[in-house]
């Protein structure tokens, strides 16, 4: 449960980026993020993804989804 604040902030910012990019609601964007494998990478402290920028994580999300 380390780095929870960083993860919460990162998830919030990435969700906002998804909503803005795809012109969907925050709720829909959150669902998309939580249904993706990216959320597991953020949650895994060993990946260190929680310390990356929201734009970097968003780019990973886009790469995985090719929407």
Regions found by a protein language model. Give the residues of each.
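C-terminal alpha-helical interaction appendages
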Residues: 1-67
